[in-house]
Amino acid sequence: MNQSDPGAMKTLGVYLFGQAKKLSLKFKKAPTMKDLMMVYYSEAKSAKVTGRKVAWITSGGPVEPLIAMGVIPVYPENHGAMIGASKMGAGLCEKAEAMGYSNDLCSYARSDIACATVNGGPIGGLPRPDMLVCCNNICGTVLKWYETQARYFNVPLFILDTPFCHTGYFEEAARYVRSQIDEYIQFIEDVCGKKYDFERLREVGLLSFE
C-alpha cells in the first residue's frame, strides 16, 4: 500500500477500526474470568450433592484421566495464588508457621495447608478432596505438601514420578511414565468404585490436542 495515498490510508483506518470494534464486542460478550471461576468452584463445592468425586491435583499433573471419569479437578496452587491476590496470605502463612511449618516453605503451600484447617481464604476453603494426585514435574515442594494434605483429610494420594528430560526423552523414560499412567487409572477406578471409561478418555485426550 502506498502510504502517501490519503484515500488508501483512510480506507485502512476505517477497516482497522471496524475490526477493533468487532473484537471489543466479542470480549464484552465473553464471560469474565471471575464468572468462569465462580461457576467452576460452585460446581466443585457441590460435588457431594451431585455425586461426583473431587481430586486435588498439581498444576502439571495429567488431568485428562480424571475428567474422563467425571472427577472434578481442583488446583491448590491456583488457590494459593487466589489467597495471595486477595491479600489473605500473610495471616494464613503465619498460622502454618504456628503449626510448625518453616517460613522458608513456599507461601502457596503454607497458605493452603493452613486454609484447610479453618476453611479460610477468599472462597472459604477448597472442597474436601476424595483423592490427591501429585506429579513432581513442577517442583519438589508439592510432594510433602500433598502428603500433608492427604494425611489431614485421610484420603489416598497418588504420586506420579516424571524423570528430568533436558534434551528430549529416552524410550526408557516413556515406558516408565506409561507404566505409572496404568497404575494411575487403576487408582482412579479404586477411588471411584467403577470401571474406567477408556472411550471417554480418548474423547477427552483429543480435545486436549485441539
Predicted segments, located by residue:
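An N-terminal assembly and electron-transfer interface module characteristic of large anaerobic redox
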Residues: 1-210
